C-alpha cells in the first residue's frame, strides 16, 4: 500500500470533525479563549427565527485571538474538563 492510501484510511477512521465560526468574548485565560457561536433556528410552531448563542471554550496555542476577533474553531479531543475545541485561524481581527 502507498503512503497516501494509509493516511486516507486513518482520516476515515478518525471521523468527521465539526467546525464553527464565532466571536471571541473573553481571552483572560492562558491559551484559552471563550467564543460565542450564534445559531439561528426557526420555531417549530410559530416559525419565528430565534438566535441561540452558545459559549465554547477553545484552545489557542499562540494566544493569537483577542476580544472581538472572528475565529474558526474545530472540534478536538477533550483538552480539559470544559475544553473540546481549538482555534484553527483568526478570520477577522477586531477593529
UniProtKB/Swiss-Prot annotation:
GO biological process: translation
Entry GO terms, CC: cytosolic small ribosomal subunit
Protein's recorded name: Small ribosomal subunit protein uS17
Domain of life: Bacteria
Keywords from the UniProt entry: Ribonucleoprotein, Ribosomal protein, RNA-binding, rRNA-binding
Cited Pfam families: Ribosomal_S17 (PF00366)
Annotated family: Belongs to the universal ribosomal protein uS17 family.
Function comment: One of the primary rRNA binding proteins, it binds specifically to the 5'-end of 16S ribosomal RNA.
GO molecular function, one term: rRNA binding
Native organism taxonomy: Bacteria, Bacillati, Actinomycetota, Actinomycetes, Kitasatosporales
Species name: Streptomyces coelicolor (strain ATCC BAA-471 / A3(2) / M145)
Quaternary structure note: Part of the 30S ribosomal subunit.
Amino acid at each position: 500500500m502507498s503512503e497516501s492510501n494509509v493516511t486516507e484510511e486513518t482520516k476515515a477512521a478518525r471521523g468527521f470533525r465539526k467546525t464553527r465560526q464565532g466571536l471571541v468574548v473573553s481571552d483572560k485565560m492562558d491559551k484559552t479563549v471563550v467564543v460565542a457561536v450564534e445559531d439561528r433556528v426557526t420555531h417549530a410552531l410559530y416559525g419565528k427565527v430565534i438566535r441561540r448563542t452558545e459559549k465554547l471554550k477553545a484552545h489557542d496555542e499562540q494566544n493569537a485571538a483577542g476580544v472581538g476577533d472572528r475565529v474558526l474553531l474545530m472540534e478536538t479531543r477533550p483538552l480539559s474538563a470544559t475544553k473540546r475545541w481549538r482555534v484553527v485561524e483568526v478570520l477577522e481581527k477586531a477593529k
